[in-house]
UniProtKB/Swiss-Prot annotation:
Biological processes, Gene Ontology terms: heme biosynthetic process; porphyrin-containing compound biosynthetic process; tetrapyrrole biosynthetic process
PTM sites of type N-acetylvaline: V84
Tissue-specificity statement: Expressed in leaves and flowers.
Keyword Transit peptide: yes
Name assigned to this protein: Ferrochelatase-2, chloroplastic
Span of the transit peptide along the chain: 1-83
Record organism: Arabidopsis thaliana
Encoding gene per record: FC2
Amino acid sequence: MNCPAMTASPSSSSSSSYSTFRPPPPLLPQLSNDSQRSVVMHCTRLPFEAFAATSSNRLLGKHSLPLRAALVTSNPLNISSSSVISDAISSSSVITDDAKIGVLLLNLGGPETLDDVQPFLFNLFADPDIIRLPPVFQFLQKPLAQFISVARAPKSKEGYASIGGGSPLRHITDAQAEELRKCLWEKNVPAKVYVGMRYWHPFTEEAIEQIKRDGITKLVVLPLYPQFSISTSGSSLRLLERIFREDEYLVNMQHTVIPSWYQREGYIKAMANLIQSELGKFGSPNQVVIFFSAHGVPLAYVEEAGDPYKAEMEECVDLIMEELDKRKITNAYTLAYQSRVGPVEWLKPYTEEAITELGKKGVENLLAVPISFVSEHIETLEEIDVEYKELALKSGIKNWGRVPALGTEPMFISDLADAVVESLPYVGAMAVSNLEARQSLVPLGSVEELLATYDSQRRELPAPVTMWEWGWTKSAETWNGRAAMLAVLALLVLEVTTGKGFLHQWGILPSL
């Protein structure tokens, strides 16, 4: 694959006569260009040494965030302007000939066979960033994960069986890594690219061991999640923090982390290209509602833990629609969240509810865009392509389309390569020409500080007390829920420790 240069956007074949239908039905939340999220303001206050407010022409206009972190954990570089960057790269000490550069791609992982499904689910639910228990009950994390994984495995196996018996995520991520390696070499960066999965092989620990064996001296950590969330990039980075703290070799390694990259021009243009291409397959492209479906997270992650995911997702959709608008594509669009698990409230609107409501409003043409996924896996191939498509057709939507995940799309891979080059601690003569394009960076060990800063100015006054119609406060309901959870956990502990009980009788838990 040849890394493409950034080119002008293709002209749109879509008519703008349907612009009167924008924004979409008011019952769904609509993103407006003037509703800038507080995350943008918060990022300017991050207390790291290296900080630059750049107006990159590779980050899109007013949405660009300033550099917000140390570039090297052991030797941070103060940057105040592009002239300083130019001075730094002209120095003879930037990247030496004996430097060994590595790129670590982080992703979720997925079961490759049906036998892998239950242990994969166990690894997933054993992660405290996925199921957040109070500290005093964290000893129940693994028993609870065992219970949930065993209970959910049969249905999950059906889903994986319907897409070929396993997840294609590893194969696709390996292909992305190889294309990224080739692209970096074309950009005169002789880097090795590694894949570390959070919940299945090759695990992050395996990738780190290979990095050490290869003698890597400069490492760029790149989560394959465009938007940052506690439960995705955050979980992977916390694991890396633990690994780095326990290893002297890693502690002394210069490394850079790119926590999110949804604002990059290449990524935005690549997404817009895919959307434009799929719109062209409809009989009336300008009458299609663009339906962005993102993986959801519990609402408490955003409101209580300070997760910036919702703000970054909404801004990402804004950026893509602005790019499409430049191409005279002015379709209606909306954003919803999928893959909700359990009884707690997640980010809304839920994808299934939003699809149903659009059908009731008379929408006949719908184009689904898996906005938070860069690889095909069960949530695109089964949840969107099968479940949501079937729901859409039942709801009255006549024409359904789905934008493919980015995969190894050349512009996307080239932009990732540029992100790596631009984030190297000392770029040197190997860099591409445009060095002002710098995404937001944090060193390992800064995940908590990052989240704290996002949350620092969110609310100065406590929210008003919400009273449910039956007379209890939301806080009381929360504590009632916690009490019920503790009762369930106590029963689960008894089941696990004694090997007896109704869960064993029903075959949900294996007998000892």
